Amino acid sequence: AKGVSVQVNMGSPDEPDMIERLGMVTQDSHYLNCPVLGMIYPRGENLNVMENDDTKAVAHAARLAFELGCTVVKTKWTGSIESFKKVTSCVPIPVLIAGGPASSSTKETLEIVHQSIQAGGGGVCMGRQVFSHENPNAMVSALKAIVHDNANVEQAMRDFGL
């Protein structure tokens, strides 16, 4: 395998089992020198009261991934550069953002990605924002330009016809 991903829903009734499973997977993966993507989301009816603060909850999710041995973490965007800096600064591993709401426009999605990179984010891990896009190849190219080539949103949209 080139890598492994494991999801934990903080606040879910199954959270303890998910955390235990993530720990076991990371232990085995480290032995095999295989990177682990922890997809950690603060959501669920049992979410700790402290975690009702979205930024603290996402920072806690990132820290949980790091402490359990993940190589990289995927979590949700907190809504601003300032708040996401609090997340990226609490761990020494790359913090990737998920794709966000299905209703987001191309420009909104690219703006979120650009802001996350400005806040120290490590990139993106997206599904529907790419696969459901009318031009998935152009969307991937625009995302790459923003994440890896320091393009701004307008430049990426113009260069790839979005």
Predicted regions and their residues:
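Thr-Gly-centered strand-to-loop micro-motif
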Residues: 98-99, 126
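Short acidic/histidine-rich active-site segments
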Residues: 124-131
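Short gly/pro/ser/thr-enriched loop/turn and capping motifs at secondary-structure boundaries
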Residues: 102-105, 131-133
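Surface-exposed loop/turn and secondary-structure junction residues enriched for glycine/proline
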Residues: 44, 133-134
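Alpha/beta enzyme core
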Residues: 1-95, 103-123, 145-146, 150-156
